[in-house]
């Protein structure tokens, strides 16, 4: 309903409005809240609101939110199969949205393989 009224919406973490600093867990919680309200939130919509949607909500979409040339490149590389259960679930994914949905609902810190800040690798999981 909020989106229908053209309100800018972003999904992010800051603990004040959620329960975790982990973006994947926040996406999972947003999905559950939408379900409880009788609304649907697809994996693609969730990813949008966590990236470009969030940048637009903060009026930073000229600098952040996607991989367009000239934008700041702060991003994480995710391992969709970080745990045995996730690997099993990903084997049964019916497509990219299903794979993203599984990551969104089962993911946590273990899925972060690498972190880049301004395009420079800042962290790699051992």
Where are the regions that the model predicts?
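C-terminal cap of metal-dependent C-N hydrolases
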Residues: 72-126
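His/Asp/Glu-enriched, well-ordered alpha-helical/loop segment
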Residues: 1-87
